[in-house]
Amino acid sequence: MLEPQDQKKLDELFSSMQEANGCFLGYPFAKDFDYEPLWRFMSLTGNNLGDPFEPGTYRVNSHAFECDVVDFFARLFRACSCEVWGYVTNGGTEGNIYGLYLARELYPNAVAYFSQDTHYSVSKGVRLLRLEHSVVRSQSNGEINYDDLAQKATRYRTRPAVVVANIGTTMKEGKDDTLKIRAVLHDVGISAIYVHSDAALCGPYAPLLNPKPAFDFADGADSITLSGHKFLGAPMPCGVVLSHKLHVQRVMRNIDYIGSSDTTLSGSRNAFTPIILWYAIRSLGIEGIKQTFQQCERLAAYTADELNVRGVSAWRNPNALTVVLPPVEDSIKTKWQIATQDVSHLVVTPGTTKQQADALIETISNRNR
């Protein structure tokens, strides 16, 4: 049992986190989830070590639910479950590094290409894996500059190309086109190509957009990653990574200690997050995901329009939940936890309310007077 001062410290931490949870708009974390029916699992020593599609010695796991989650996204990303393998990660960074790892094992002499708007985890990944890489310029909307990609790739036309396609860039939610990427590389004479789609935020709803962005397996992706906590919602970071089975077989090793194949990046893995993601997709279904996106998109459009009416130059990419605006001052950035680089942005995720949006709009417009 805790000492009174320790209990007080714990209570104060909860109050602080609860207050901060009610006033952040700058990072993509869904907030309207309710997983109380799942709390009983927290009393178990769950560990999803090993390949989720193989039996293993340790049985306190949620592998069956993890496989359901992978199968759901395989179908959503237009792939046959028999041809695609995947697992639940601890977030988008692990998914990106895993995709790059598979690419390096396929093409050890490859050059990796990604735009300047790419998430920082990709730069970390190429350094960890010692992949030679080239950073490509972005268009003003955050999408990769295909002309610059062609120019950069021409220098290394005799070597395989690994490209990270952003399906919703970190700051502007710009979406790269995997079909265009492959066409550009073919035009400069490169035929050995691996494309990894980073769909951290947009993965659950991108297949439902009209027009649908080109990013999935039918559009030439070799691997795809998405985050579970950003749009579907979870109390802890999580994600899913999927790839063609042929790529995964190159890294597979049999481990007697666990009685299973080692195909994942991490050994011990969270058994709780696959249950959360399973619960989310079973509760929502495709139609629920679509309706949730439409609600968020309407609020994002309203927010951008209201800011512009009040003299703030805000904009969105088509079908984006991210509202881009000029850099906000430090007091606003601190209170509302607004991500800021050369621009600031706010992200309307499930659980974001009109009251929150109005309060931020009022604060920003008052500072601009």
Curated annotation (Swiss-Prot):
Catalytic reactions of this protein: L-histidine + H(+) = histamine + CO2
Its EC number(s): 4.1.1.22
Keywords of this entry: Decarboxylase, Lyase, Pyridoxal phosphate
InterPro entries from the UniProt entry: Group_II_Decarboxylase (IPR051151), Hist_deCOase_bac (IPR023523), PyrdxlP-dep_de-COase (IPR002129), PyrdxlP-dep_Trfase (IPR015424), PyrdxlP-dep_Trfase_major (IPR015421)
Gene Ontology terms describing biological process: carboxylic acid metabolic process
Cofactor(s) required, per the database record: pyridoxal 5'-phosphate
Domain of life assignment: Bacteria
Pfam families: Pyridoxal_deC
Record's keyword annotation contains Zinc-finger: no
Gene3D superfamilies assigned to the protein according to its UniProt record, in alphabetical order: Type I PLP-dependent aspartate aminotransferase-like (Major domain)
Root EC class: lyase
Residues bearing the modification N6-(pyridoxal phosphate)lysine: 230
GO MF entries: histidine decarboxylase activity; pyridoxal phosphate binding
UniProt-annotated binding residues for substrate: 119
Protein family: Belongs to the group II decarboxylase family.
Subunit architecture: Homotetramer.
Record's protein name: Histidine decarboxylase
Organism field: Mesorhizobium japonicum (strain LMG 29417 / CECT 9101 / MAFF 303099)
